[in-house]
UniProtKB/Swiss-Prot annotation:
Necessary cofactors: Mg(2+)
Source species, domain of life: Eukaryota
Protein encoded by which gene: pfk
Name by which UniProt lists this protein: ATP-dependent 6-phosphofructokinase
Localization of this protein: Glycosome
Main function: Catalyzes the phosphorylation of D-fructose 6-phosphate to fructose 1,6-bisphosphate by ATP, the first committing step of glycolysis.
Catalytic function, reaction form: beta-D-fructose 6-phosphate + ATP = beta-D-fructose 1,6-bisphosphate + ADP + H(+)
Amino acid sequence: MENRLRDTSRVVRSHAAPLNEVTQEDLKVERLHGRKYMNPSKKHVMREEFSDKIEHIMHDPRPQEGVHSELPVSISPLLCELAAPRQRIHFNPPETVVGIVTCGGICPGLNDVIRSLTLTAVNAYRVKRVIGFRFGYWGLSKKGSHTAMELYRTSVTSIHRYGGTILGSSRGPQDTSEMVDTLERLGVNILFTVGGDGTQRGALKIAEEAKRRGANLAVFGIPKTIDNDLSFSHRTFGFETAVDKAVEAVRAAYAEAISLNYGVGVVKLMGRDSGFIAAEAAVASAQANICLVPENPISEDIVMALIQRRFETSRSCVIIVAEGFGQDWEGGTGGHDASGNKKLTDIGVVLTKRIQAWLRKNKERYPNGTVKYIDPSYMIRACPPSANDALFCATLSTLAMHEAMAGATNCIIALRYNSYILVPIKVATSVRRVLDLRGQLWRQVREITVGLQDDVRAFKEAEVRRELEAISLVRERLIGQLSKL
C-alpha cells in the first residue's frame, strides 16, 4: 500500500542544522580548564576504568561499500567521545557543591537518577553539599530559589521505589540571569539538568551565561525523553518501562475487542514526533492489527479501509495510535505549551469518535460494532522503572557525575551502540530521531499488521491450502483402506 510507505530520514530538523551538516568540531565536548585534583577513589585509580585519555567510538560502525583497505572505513567520518571516570578531576570534592533540577513531564526513572547522582556525589566523592532545586527551573528563579532542599544519603535511599520526582517539576523557561545568580549565591559548581529538549536548551543558556561571567560552573544534561527520540542516542531512560506498560494496555484492548462482535480496541500511546513506543509495543504484544505513527501520516479513509480489511478476516481489531499521529485531521489545536511544544489534538478521542461514526454508518454489515478506548499515558509516566531501566539510570547518572567532576560541561550523556558517550547540548538538541520506515522495526510492524494489498488474498489462499491438505489426507486414508480389501 503506497499510502503507508512514505519515505523518511532517520532524523528530522529541530531548531538547528540537520545531522548531515554536523562536523567533528561540533562533537568536541567542552571541558573546564585544569585537572589538578586526584580522584578520591584512590584504591581504584590504577585500574583500567579510570583514565585521563579521551577515547572515541565511531558514530556509525557500518563500513563503506567498495572501499578496499586493510582497515574498514566507516560510512560516517564522525567520532563520539566516550564517557568514563577520570583519574584527575577538575573540582576539589570537599569544596564542591552539586545541584540537581528535574524539568518537564514526569517519566519512569527520575527518582533513580536523583538517587544515583546524590549517592555517587556523597559516597564516591564526598562532596560538600548536594542541592535539589524544586519544581524545575522555577526553583532556580528569584521567586522559587527559597524552596531548594539539601539531599543526603538518607533522604534518597528509598526514593527509587516510587514514580515521579521528589524534586517536583514544571514547564517553561525562567530568566537565565536570575538562575545563574541563584547558582552563584549558593556556590554551586556542578548543575545537573534532567529533562528534554527544552530543558537542555535552557541548560545551554545557563552554561553560556556562566561562561560569560567567568564562573567555575559545569552544566551537565541527563536527557529525559520517554519517546526515545534523542539524536545520537539509541535508548533513553524510561523508554523500556513505557513499552512494557504499553504492552499491558494493548493486551487489555485485545481482550475487550475479541469479547465483542466486531469490537475495536484503540490504545493511544506517547510519541509526539516519533512512534518508537507505538511500534515496539505493536511488535512486542503481537496483538495490534493497525499501528499509526507520526512518521507515516495517512488519511481517515485509509484508516477505515484498514479496519474494513481486518473485519474481512476477523471480528476484532486492535489499533495503536501515537499521540502525534493525525494532527491534520481536525486542523490542529494551534499554539504551544509552556515548554514550547506544539499543542496536540487528542487523536485518541478523535479516532475513537470517527470509528464509532463509521460503525454506525455500516451497522448492517457490522452489527453491534463497538469501540473501547484506552489511554494509559499518565499511568505509564508515573510508574517506577523496570529493573533494567533502573540499572540504566544508575549507569547514566554515575558516569555523568564522574565526567562532571572532571570538568565536562555544556553536554549530555547518551547510550549509543551499547557505549556511553558525551554529546554537546547544541548538537544533541539540533535534530530529533524518528522511525525509519525502511528500517527493521517498521518492517516488523508491517509484517504483523493489516495492509491494503494482499492480506485478505493471502488469508483466503491459506484457507484453501488447509482445505486441500485436509482433502488430501482423507483421500490417502481412503486409498489405504481400499488397498487392504
